[in-house]
Amino acid sequence: MEVEVKAKQAKAAARRMAVLDENTKNLALNHMADALIKDMGKILEANKKDVVEAEKRNIKASLIDRLKLDEKRVEAMAKGLREISALPDPVGSIEKMWKRPNGLQIGKMRVPIGVIGIIYESRPNVTADAAGLCLKSGNAVILRGGSDAINSNIAISSILAKAAYETGIPEGAIQLIENTDREEVNRMMKLNGLIDLIIPRGGASLIKNVIENSTVPVIETGVGNCHIFVDETAKFNIAKDIIVNAKVQRPGVCNAVETVLVHKSIAKEFLPLMVEELTSLGVEIRGCQITKEICPQVKEATDKDWETEYLDLILAVKVVDGIEEALDHISKYSTGHSESIITENYENAMMFLKSVDSAAVYVNASTRFTDGGEFGFGAEIGISTQKMHARGPMGLEELTTYKYVILGSGQIRK
């Protein structure tokens, strides 16, 4: 089976990856970036095949946007690899060191996780991001992208692997599962002992399937039912601009806003301004009963809308009595990704920051900033919505673990 053969190769490569020096890794990353630019034509040609097939199957426009590559996006992938090369290498760093009364020196050293499996859907840029981050953090990576992007992923991964191996990276460190049969994914999720960690990136159904069926440890990522609460002291122009950015800039990504909650005391003034702006930009508004009374042109929301990650130009809107009801709503429906409050009230801002149990919580800013690059981590492997090991944008450090190193001078336990 393809995945088992490649997992064994990755396991062998991981031992050598763990001891690679930083200069070799940085040289490889920059060579990989050069190769993406040099072979951009091959990448775009392969991507065109994927896009044509997606259009034939009437895939949603927002999902085709995630799939589509152009010169600018390939250049951004290359830039991301260069940025990763410029980041400090976490591997081998000692976080703490202390001395025991018997003279033993004990420290916590950052080390690679080993072999990381990435299961993702239709965003071919993930192929480059994942390969780069895993390489810099000393891990071998097995990539399994969605069938929608198979031609793009084969082109990108083969270009990256060739460039990496030319600069001293062990063969088997960057591999793509080319078989699009779902059984390969099921086998991949059972390869304990060969794969150390699986990170799924994609929609709710993909992540749910991996969590429920993988015997390999999983970090849950990505599903983003994100909220913005417009408090009664919010400045309307700021609130409107933030909501438009969070919904319209890239509606098909996990940090786009899906539900806006509006304080009842400003609803009659603010909602018409917001609805007019959003509808002019092609957004479909689904509102609660009060929203519909104020703006009759909107569609009526159902309970299903409050729990839906649309990944499209659709926005649910609800009028709430105040911050307590907003917090209750977010607690009930949030996926723990990103939430924002628009307010000039310091106490409410602090209450929101402390009360909302999500990976990223904002005051007066768009949820679209939940991103490794925007946080200064360089590219990210995903946004973790769980609490164990990693939370929020997962950069280099989150792709490592630690071990204790103990330095002695002949001590024995008595």
Swiss-Prot record:
Location(s), subcellular: Cytoplasm
Keywords attached to this Swiss-Prot or TrEMBL record, sorted alphabetically, are: Amino-acid biosynthesis, Cytoplasm, NADP, Oxidoreductase, Proline biosynthesis
Q: Which reaction does it catalyse?
A: L-glutamate 5-semialdehyde + phosphate + NADP(+) = L-glutamyl 5-phosphate + NADPH + H(+)
Q: Name one GO cellular component term.
A: cytoplasm
Give the record's GO biological process terms: L-proline biosynthetic process
An example molecular function term from Gene Ontology annotations: NADP binding
Q: In which pathway does it act?
A: Amino-acid biosynthesis; L-proline biosynthesis; L-glutamate 5-semialdehyde from L-glutamate: step 2/2
EC number(s): the record gives 1.2.1.41
Q: Which CDD domains match?
A: ALDH_F18-19_ProA-GPR (cd07079)
Q: Does the keyword Methyltransferase apply?
A: no
Signal sequence annotation = none
A family per Pfam:
Aldedh
Q: Read off the NCBIfam families from this record.
A: PRK00197.1, proA
UniProt family annotation:
Belongs to the gamma-glutamyl phosphate reductase family.
Protein task:
Catalyzes the NADPH-dependent reduction of L-glutamate 5-phosphate into L-glutamate 5-semialdehyde and phosphate. The product spontaneously undergoes cyclization to form 1-pyrroline-5-carboxylate.
| Name assigned to this protein | Gamma-glutamyl phosphate reductase
Q: Which organism is it from?
A: Thermoanaerobacter sp. (strain X514)
Q: What is the lineage of its organism?
A: Bacteria, Bacillati, Bacillota, Clostridia, Thermoanaerobacterales
